[in-house]
Every structure is written in C-alpha cells, then in structure tokens.
A protein has these predicted regions:
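Switch/communication elements of ASCE P-loop NTPase nucleotide-binding domains
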Residues: 1, 233, 239-394, 425, ...
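Glycine-rich phosphate-binding loops of NTPases
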Residues: 3, 7-32, 36-168, 175-179, ...
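Short alpha-helical segments and helix-capping/turn motifs at coil-helix boundaries
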Residues: 15-23, 49-54, 115-129, 221-224, ...
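Conserved nucleotide-binding/hydrolysis micro-motifs of P-loop NTPases
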Residues: 41-44, 72-76, 146-149, 293, ...
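Short helix/loop capping segments that flank catalytic or ligand/cofactor-binding pockets
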Residues: 45-48, 150-153, 249-250, 257-260, ...
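Extended helical coiled-coil dimerization/tether regions that scaffold
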Residues: 136, 144, 148-289, 315-316, ...
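The start of beta-strands in P-loop NTPase/AAA+ ATPase cores
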Residues: 138, 285-286, 404, 464
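Acidic, Mg2+-coordinating catalytic modules of nucleic-acid enzymes
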Residues: 380-407, 411-646
C-alpha cells in the first residue's frame, strides 16, 4: 500500500468512504501500479537471452517492452468496498487501515508481461510461460541510506571486505590467491589440531571411559577446520594509515568512509553483474547509485564523479574477456557532481506542486531549442547554447536544483541581494509564505543578457525574476556630422529621453520605446511563453517577472546605483571614510545637493563591488534587532522579491 501514489490512495479511501462512485464497468480502467521497461536492440546485439520476449520479428520493430502490473479489476474493487463496510468497525472506520491490511486480497499477483509495441492486448505472460527475468535484466543499486557511521563499534568497511572475498570472480589471479590462502590454512589446521588435542585431553579421556566393549565408538579428536570464506567474516579490520601509524576505520571522516564504502560496494555489485565464468551475464545490466555526495565535501565529490566512469568501465570486463553492457544511473542533489558531469548525460526531474507528478527532461533536448531554420539566427542560438553549457557547468549548476531563480546584472546585486532578501523578510513578514532566505532560490549573474537564459527558464519551468536596468537614452544629432544620430545616456525623466538600450527588455517585451516601460504597471511585467509563436507575452499569472527602475520619491533612476543613492542619502552621510569606493569630491557634491543621484552614480563610483560590501559593513540594526535598518531597498527590487516570495 505504501507504494501506491497519492492520487490512487486518495481515490481508494474516498471510494470506501462513499465520497466517490466508480465509472460504469464498460468505462472502467483497472487501478494500481504499472511499470514499463523499454528495451531497444539492433542486429549487433546477442539476442539469445531475449529471444523469448521478442514480440515482433519485423526488422523495423526493434523494441522489447516488459510490463509489470499490480492492478484491481472492477468486480474486485466492488467486493473490496462491500467487505470494508462489513468490517469497518474493526478498523476504526478508517479506509486507510483496511487497505493497508487487506489490499493484497483484491489486487492479486503482480502480472509480468512482454507486450507488443503498438498493441498492448498482444502479450506474453512471463510467469505462465516460465520465462526467467534473471537472464534478461539484472538491476543492482547502492542506496542513499548507507550504513556508514564513525561509531567505535561500526565496522562497515571491514565487513565489506569479507563480502568482497565471498563474491570475488573466479579469475586466475583470484584463484591463485585463494589457493595460497587455503594452503596456509591447512598448515594452520595441523598446528591447531595438536593444540586442541592438549586443550580437550581431559574431557576426551572422560568420554573414552564410556566406550565399553567398543572403545573406538568414543575415541574422538578435536580437529581444526578453518573455512577460508568464513574466516574473513568478523576477522578482518580495515585500517587507514596516518603518518607511521594505523588507525581504525571509525577514526576516519564520514566522507572518506562513505567514498571507500561505495567503491567496495561497486566492486561487489559489479561482481554480481559479471557473474561467475560458468554463467552468462544478463542481457541488460543496470546499476543505480543514489546520492553519492553524502557526508562528502565538494572536492571529494569532484574526485568521485571524475573517476566513477573509469571505475565502472574497468569492472565491465571479465577474466574470460567478456565485456558486459552496463547502464549506470547516478541520482544527486549536488551541484558539484552536476558541474563535473557531461551536460548531455544529465536528466532533470521536477515534481509539480499542483499535480504531484514528476516530469523528467533530458538536458540534451535543450539543444534543439537553440536552433533555427534561419542560418544567421541559428549561428547566434548555437553560440548561446555553447555559452550556456559552459556557464552552467562551471558556475551555476545549482540552478538545476532551485525552485526559483533570480537573474541579476552583476557583482553589486549579487553581494547585496541576500541582505535585501533578509531585510524584506524582517520588515514585511508573511504568515502564508516561507521567508525568501528559507526558499530554494538560485541567484545567477547574467549582465544585461538574461535573454540567453530564456529557453532554459522555459525548459526548467521555475518561477524566475529578472532584475535589470532601464538604461534610458536620448537621440542627439552629431555636432560634426548632421546626418549622424548619437545615443546619449540620460535620466528617464529627461524630456528628450526616448528609448532603452537594454537588450533584455527589448527581447522580452518587444519594444525599445521608453514611455512603454515608464508607464508599465507592475502586474503587466509578468510573462509567459506563447506556444503559438514561441515568444514571451505579458500575462499577469506568468512565471517570469522582469523588473527595472521605477519612479520613487519623485526621482526616476536609470541604474541600480542611482536608485540606491536617491533613497539612502542619510547612509551616505557617514562620509568618505565609510565609503572609500566613492570619489570624495563627487560624494561631497551629492551630499551638499549640488548634483543629483544620476550624476553622482555616473561619476562618483570607483568600484561597484566594493560599494556593495561597504553598504553591508555600514549597516546597523534597529532597537528591535532588525538588521540593515539604516538603508532602504529600491522599490523595483522590493516589489520583485515580494512577488517571488509568494
């Protein structure tokens, strides 16, 4: 029952409670658990082990589909309800308790079938035909719940060595070593036999007195019979060397113990997959390794993923030269392991919070989205995809594990944004939503090029916030060439300001017109991807929000810096000693009111990352303990973060 999915459990419990009725029998589809294993083959494969489950001899059909079903039919489901109603009192009138205890009486046995690719009504019953799956599929796995601890009485690694010996291949090298081991044991048996005879002599003499007329009946010996396989069990200890000393395994860190244990376990499982020299390996061999990153630091995770393929490859070859085909699957929540993996090998799995279904996607499918029929556009898209692969694997692999994402322009926002998130959570707490810093949010620096990531945003389907600049400019006739029009940066409030130079804004909203952005309401800054023409469209329920500077306290900023300066003049009054990244001359002019925030931001900032750090260094808590109380978050960023928090 615990294997039933949430929807099936809910349906069965509601049905037994009388809150749901079944469809008519002719429309009813059996309920339960279904698993289908799809196997592809070609003419180069050895089909001897799968010949019994091949359903179609047509060369065009190269599929084997193994189906496993645990289902309840209409009549059995009706009987289930009737029986529950009769016995409900014994189960506290709780359908869940009855189903846990009795479901097996109605679902019956697990059906194992080989079905036709395009017609499931055509199948071979594997149990009825007595077809053994052992020769077709062999699946081994290393669970995430490993028994590695560093308690003194734990001997996980030591116990694994005895198991390794028991499962070792019958290779010439192994046989030779085993024979040498047995030879030494026989010598030891002779020595121990003499010692045992002396140890047990007293009791043996007493036994002999009961021999009567046939002394030979009670003439016993105590012999040593050391068994080479059993001897290792409980009698081997893995030690690790530290300088000139050997220390017990539990003295080592959990990370190293976990890594060594996995290597031991891989050796054991691969031995099972290879099988003995007298047996043929299964046609399909699958090895699952769950969350190898447990207890390990990033560098160790890099070492693991960089070496695991070679380790598995070495273990695929048997002593007789047979090379087993192996598919290995590693599940992970580690961005470090993903960063060191081949991009095309990665599968992305995401659970939908509404339907509770898990959607699986291959990252190599993303490449097809960065292609076009137009040659020029195709070249641009392919270069973007190449950059995206490099950037994600080298810098931001954690994006694959995020529930939400923020795309920012640069270092300034990256440094100060977590503080802004914490400040918003403290000043504007929500009873319904988790604080921003408690949510799984990834922050990605993209400059003014968030459009490069738009197909990835769509592919991942995660709620995303783009924080960018309005980058306003005006068109001015060139003094020397009247036919040339120059773009000149200016405040958005400049009467001559007409356009934005921000490529991201132009890409998402399809216009450079400045008035469009100045008048755009916050709700209209949300976007969804249109399936019709594959472009982003305004949608107040969209999962992508693009925010930029807006008018605040009578001032319309062009960039993050002048937006911050315009509302945080009291903080800057701490002076040049507190903000050495700001040019003293321009800082004094701004504090004296001789220039506005725009001119100060354009001329007075020496280092933007240093400025962000200085903002944090000069932050003060208020009397209530709320941090960062002596400065304010620009409105456009605050609105965006509050939207993302919901």
């Amino acid at each position: 029952y615990e294997d039933f999915n949430v929807d099936l459990r809910s349906f069965l419990e509601a049905y037994l409670d009388g809150n749901l009725e079944l469809l008519p029998e002719e429309s009813f589809v059996p309920l339960g658990i279904r698993l289908k294993l799809y196997i592809k083959y070609d003419l180069n494969d050895d089909l001897s082990q799968v010949s019994q489950v091949i359903m179609n001899l047509d060369p065009a059909d190269d599929n084997i589909i193994l189906s496993f079903e645990y289902l309840v039919e209409y009549n059995e489901l009706s009987q289930l309800k009737a029986d529950y109603l009769d016995a409900a009192d014994k189960f506290e009138n709780k359908p869940k308790l009855y189903l846990k205890d009795k479901h097996g009486d109605y679902f019956g046995r697990i059906l194992k079938k080989s079905i036709l690719f395009d017609d499931e009504s055509q199948f071979i019953d594997l149990q009825k035909e007595r077809i053994n799956l052992k020769d077709i599929v062999s699946i081994q796995f290393i669970s995430a719940k490993r028994s590695v601890t560093n308690k003194q009485n734990d001997k996980t690694l030591s116990n694994q060595t005895s198991t390794l010996y028991k499962q070792a291949d019958e290779s010439e090298e192994q046989i030779e070593a085993s024979d040498e081991f047995k030879k030494e044991l026989r010598k030891t048996d002779e020595v121990l036999g003499g010692i045992y005879q002396k140890m047990f002599d007293g009791v043996i003499q007493k036994v002999n007195k009961f021999g009567g007329l046939s002394p030979s009946e009670t003439d016993i010996r105590v012999a040593s019979t050391l068994q080479h396989r059993e001897l290792l069990e409980g009698n081997t200890t893995v030690m690790y060397a530290h300088r000139d000393h050997e220390l017990p395994e539990h003295y080592n860190g959990l990370g190293y113990m976990n890594l060594i244990s996995m290597i031991f376990e891989i050796e054991m499982l691969m031995s099972r997959l290879r099988r003995s020299l007298s047996e043929k390996p299964a046609a399909v061999n699958v090895l699952f390794i769950e969350e190898p990153e447990a207890h390990t630091h990033p560098q160790m995770q890099y070492v693991f993923i960089n070496n695991i393929k070679e380790l598995l490859k070495e273990n695929q070859k048997r002593e007789d030269g047979l090379f087993i085909e192996l598919q290995s699957i590693i599940t992970t929540h580690s961005s470090h392991i993903v960063a060191e993996s081949d991009f095309d090998d990665i599968k992305f799995l995401k659970k939908c919070s509404v339907s509770h279904r898990v959607v699986a996607k291959n990252l190599k499918e993303l490449a097809s989205r960065y292609q076009s029929q137009d040659a020029k556009e195709d070249e641009i898209l392919r270069s973007r995809y190449k950059f995206l692969k490099q950037y994600l694997t080298l810098n931001r692999a954690e994006l694959f594990f995020a529930d939400k994402a923020i795309f920012i322009e640069g270092d300034t926002e990256r440094i100060v944004l977590p503080a802004m998130m914490k400040k918003i959570d403290m000043e504007d707490p929500s009873q319904k939503e988790l604080p921003l810093l408690s949510q799984n949010i990834s922050i990605v620096e993209v400059g003014a090029h968030s459009q490069i990531f738009e197909k990835l945003i769509e592919f991942l389907g995660i709620k995303s916030l783009v924080i960018t600049d309005i980058d306003s400019y005006k068109e001015v006739q060139d003094d020397d060439n009247p036919n040339q029009i120059n773009r000149v940066k200016c405040k958005p409030s400049d009467p001559a300001a007409s356009h934005t130079s921000n490529n991201s804004l132009d890409f998402y909203f399809g216009t450079k017109d400045l008035d469009f952005y100045k008048n755009l309401e916050f709700d209209n800054k949300s976007l969804n991807k249109s399936e019709k023409d594959n472009t982003w469209k305004q949608d107040d329920s969209g999962f992508l929000k693009v925010v930029y500077q807006t008018e605040e306290q009578g001032y319309f900023a062009r960039s993050y810096e002048d937006a911050f300066f315009s509302i945080n003049k009291p903080l800057l009054e701490l002076g040049h000693d507190a903000f050495p990244s700001l040019t003293k001359k321009w800082l004094n002019k701004y504090l004296d009111g001789n220039i506005d925030a725009y001119k100060f931001a354009e001329n007075g900032v020496g280092s933007k990352p240093s400025l962000a750090i200085e903002i944090l260094l000069n932050s003060k808590p208020d009397a209530g303990g709320n941090e960062f109380s002596n400065w304010q978050v620009p409105l456009y960023i605050k609105e965006g973060l509050l939207w993302l928090r919901n």
